[in-house]
Swiss-Prot record:
BP term (GO), one: chemical synaptic transmission
Designated name of the protein: PDZ domain-containing protein GIPC1
Record's keyword terms, sorted: Cytoplasm, Membrane, Phosphoprotein
Membrane topology, from the record: Peripheral membrane protein
PROSITE patterns: PDZ
Source organism of this protein record: Rattus norvegicus
SUPFAM superfamilies reported for this sequence: PDZ domain-like
Subunit structure and binding partners: Interacts with SDC4/syndecan-4 and SEMA4C/semaphorin-4C. Interacts with RGS19 (C-terminus), GLUT1 (C-terminus), ACTN1, KIF1B, MYO6 and PLEKHG5.
Family annotation (SMART domains): PDZ
Phylogenetic lineage: Eukaryota, Metazoa, Chordata, Craniata, Vertebrata
């Protein structure tokens, strides 16, 4: 069917200049949030978890980002299970874990743990710290935020655009979890739902954000960053294989993405940020996987509808994704 002829539900871009990040879910955790949204891949048939004896026995080292002894965790197949294992190792409630970074204790958004973990990656868990409420006057349509989520019900700030409305409010920082907007709880919401709410707030009015920042060690208390930058932090992990976490079905050990796939994923993630105000490398990876063998944009659109229909991607976005995958295939970077 030609693209755009009633093949799926239509929706305008959630965020035009504002950004929302593809959730860290990278695991497609398909739980409906308070706003009625649901995780990607919810329509797929669920597979029973494999017997424990058949799961790959992989042991990872972990620390709390603000400082702790080193723990060892194993036997998880998705982000929620991972957070549970970390909580057990450090005797914390699982709900205290906000997100994890790989190979750095810093709040580095380029090192967020998504749906893949290198076999020698070191996991740093960032837990809840100080809570704060901030009043924001929406003087412009775009607030300058990029939102992501952790795949387990928490949406947080991944990037703050320089010179934006939010950039002028020093109390708001990258890594802050968005608990509520004007008293409406966002716990359990996906990144794109939070981005939509922020976009729909009326211009020229004040709204209240309830935030929780990651707990900081003394050496981490400094001027806030506008977001991660490539190359920051030590590279502790050297394993070439990755453990891919899934919300349905077993975790699998896979090779790292090819150069083409890495570049295509990066470009699609940029498109997600531009169109929807979200960043989500795992969502981008899923889209590249769906599109790399398709012959035309219509086939890609049908595949996206079938697998990721809840996102209701606009036609122009699908065309740009098709173009990004095609450019990466022929080396046009």
């Amino acid at each position: 069917m030609p693209l755009g002829l009633g093949r799926r539900k239509k929706a305008p871009p959630l965020v035009e200049n504002e950004e929302a990040e593809p959730s860290r879910s990278g695991l497609g955790v398909g739980e409906p949030g308070p706003l009625g949204g649901s995780g990607a891949g919810e329509s797929q048939m669920g597979l029973p978890p494999p017997p424990a004896s058949l799961r790959p026995r992989l042991v990872f080292h972990t620390q709390l980002a603000h400082g702790s002894p080193t723990g060892r965790i194993e036997g998880f197949t998705n982000v929620k299970e991972l957070y549970g294992k970390i909580a057990e190792a450090f005797r914390l409630p699982a709900a205290e874990v906000m997100f994890c970074t790989l190979n750095t204790h810093k709040v580095d958004m380029d090192k967020l743990l998504g749906g893949q973990i290198g076999l020698e990656d070191f996991i740093f868990a960032h837990v809840k710290g100080q809570r704060k409420e901030v009043e924001v006057f929406k003087s412009e349509d775009a607030l300058g935020l990029t939102i992501t989520d952790n795949g387990a019900g928490y949406a947080f700030i991944k990037r703050i655009k320089e010179g934006s409305v939010i950039d002028h409010i020093q109390l708001i920082s990258v890594g802050d979890m968005i608990e509520a907007i004007n008293g409406q709880s966002l716990l359990g919401c996906r990144h794109y739902e939070v981005a939509r709410l922020l976009k729909e707030l009326p211009r020229g009015r004040t709204f209240t954000l309830k935030l929780t920042e990651p707990r900081k060690a003394f050496d981490m208390i400094s001027q806030r960053s506008s977001g991660g930058h490539p190359g920051s932090g030590p590279q502790l992990g050297t394993g070439r294989g990755t453990l891919r976490l899934r919300s349905r079905g077993p975790a699998t050990v896979e090779d790292l993405p090819s150069a083409f796939e890495e570049k295509a994923i990066e470009k699609v993630d940029d498109l997600l940020e531009s169109y929807m105000g979200i960043r989500d490398t795992e969502l981008a990876a899923t889209m590249v996987e769906l599109g790399k063998d398709k012959r035309n944009p219509d086939e890609l659109a049908e595949a996206l509808d079938e697998r990721l229909g809840d996102f209701a991607f606009p036609d122009e976005f699908v065309f740009d994704v098709w173009g990004a995958i095609g450019d990466a295939k022929v080396g046009r970077y």
